[in-house]
Design a protein with these regions (language model features):
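Short alpha-helical "recognition helix" segments of helix-turn-helix
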Residues: 55-61, 67
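The DNA-recognition helices of helix-turn-helix-type DNA-binding domains
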Residues: 50, 63, 74-75
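Short, amphipathic alpha-helical "recognition" segments used to contact nucleic acids or chromatin
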Residues: 37-51
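Short, solvent-exposed alpha-helical "recognition" segments
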Residues: 70-85
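Long, compositionally biased
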Residues: 47-55, 87-88
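N-terminal helix-turn-helix DNA-binding core of bacterial DNA-binding proteins
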Residues: 31-34, 45, 55
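General nucleic-acid-binding
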Residues: 1-15
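Short, Lys/Arg-enriched anionic-surface-contact patches
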Residues: 20-39
């Protein structure tokens, strides 16, 4: 891992307040990047809830390819996003 990447990750780990995290992400991401991140998270959450892939694509307005990519990710036992969801 590059030192600047490690520094960014450490800084993000310091944020404890959702409102502060929103401000930090707003500083770091463009609106379209933030929207893409939100869409990816929403896809993973719906997959976790057992919503069928085609229904997710319809609800989210995304492509079935993106949903399928998320489903493949969620099937991976090493999926960090699934582990994070388990802690929420």
């Amino acid at each position: 891992m590059k030192p600047d990447e490690a520094h960014l990750l450490q800084a993000l780990c310091e944020v404890r307040d959702p409102a502060e995290m929103r401000r930090v992400l707003s500083d770091l991401l463009t609106r379209s990047e933030a929207a893409a991140l939100h869409k990816r998270w929403a896809i993973l959450c719906l997959l976790r809830d057992g919503v069928p892939q085609r229904e997710i694509a319809r609800r989210i307005g995304g492509s079935l390819c993106n949903v399928t990519r998320g489903a493949r990710l969620m099937r991976n036992p090493a999926c960090a996003s699934a582990a994070l969801m388990d802690r929420l």
